[in-house]
Amino acid sequence: MEKWFIASKRADFNKIGEIFHISPVTARLMRNRSLTTVREMQRYLYGSLSDLYDSHLLKDADKGAEIIKEKIETGKKIRIISDYDVDGVSSNYILYQGLKRCGADVDYKIPDRVEDGYGINEHLIEKAAEDGIDTIITCDNGIAAAEQIAYGNSLGLTLIVTDHHDIPFQRQEDGSISYNLPSAAAVINPKQKDCPYPFENICGAVVVYKFIQVLYDLFGIDRRESEVFLEIAAMATVCDVMPLCDENRIIVKEGLRRIQHTNITGLQALIEANHLEEKKISSYHFGFILGPCINASGRLTSAKDALELLLCEDKELCRQKAEALTQLNAERKEMTANGVKAAKEYLESTGHANDKVLVVYLPNCHESIAGIIAGRMKEHYHKPVFVITRTKEGLKGSGRSIEAYHMYKEMNKIKECFDKFGGHPMAAGFSMQEDRLEEFREKLNANATLTEDDFAEKVHIDVALPISY
């Protein structure tokens, strides 16, 4: 049964409406977004790029930029290693183009989802050393790779981590928490406890967008040049499901305005391949049409295909690449539908549908769509869901959660079950050995304190509209 919640925050909505020349209903919507001051409301309604936070506030951004400047000026080779989703591809694109603008000798690698798994690993580090790379920059990954970063250090590489994921931690016997940061030359992540950046809920692409601004400042490049990356940063923000408040709202608004006349040939080709050239692009198109086409490459072939589309400047070649990604996404949709059907059958046949935390084992499912299936199952059952598949190395899984269940913290309580894991309150990924599967299921459910109220679908209502509205 649904639970309805009607927001009841109070304010003089008529007065707010008069100040900003908006209706009292819109004023109530703003108040329900926890906006209390005139300045906050002004920024919410009319925020511009001048309202974005100072990029130099990101901890280690200046330090990292100084390191990169020295590497560029001495001709050292730099390699970018990103994630394979929309945020990872977008981060890689922004970082690559920004470093090129500064004169860097730079290339990129994107881990293969099946062969490499998520994030930087020993194989990628060894390959970089063999290729004569001096410096590795991660984007949208690396914060949970302390061992891998240490290994890179031992090979004499310089490593810089840019990421936005939660910082790995351990709870001590006395109840205190110790955070496990990688020993990189610079760690740029707004979720560090001592980072003075005012807003931590930015995606990986926005982190590197900010870093490139700092680098441009150091090289004396007009930072307005970095605005060419805004439509890419906006798409990543939406596709990585960042909250559309604070500066994210400004970035997405500006990105949507600019994408109508984008100069990124590959992005324009993707818009045309999906027949959106005559439409006003919205956040819906980012999240449900354009983004999934980019994601499809990382899921089914190689995310390098999507990155090469964004970097391509030949119109005909871009058209071919964009159409291929669009077709790939159609195939992914069909695979997802079959996977969702199999997941429901599994839960009902095993009786696990009654568990508080649902663990679905689909050994023959393509690992790349496990997260999508988990999301669909969460929407259907309104419970936290983990979907696990079999790979050559063992099991891999993705989880999607509900508001009442902090997925990353719960996984941290049973970290002995995993080979690797990481994530957010609402989503996570991991690898494990097959003989830990039942232990994983049992411990998750034994620890779960969820109640029937937590499983009720929650509908948040801002205001009951007058009939005349």
Functional labels for PLM-detected ranges:
Residues 1-3:
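Catalytic domains of riboflavin
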Residues 6:
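Non-catalytic nucleic-acid-binding/docking modules located in mid-to-C-terminal regions
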Residues 9-135, 155-156, 172-175, 183, ...:
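Hydrophobic helix-and-loop "lid/oligomerization" segment in the mid-to-C-terminal part
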Residues 126-205, 209-218, 228, 245:
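Active-site cavity-forming subdomains of large catalytic enzyme subunits
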Residues 261-264, 447-469:
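A contiguous loop/helix-start segment that scaffolds small-molecule binding in enzyme catalytic cores
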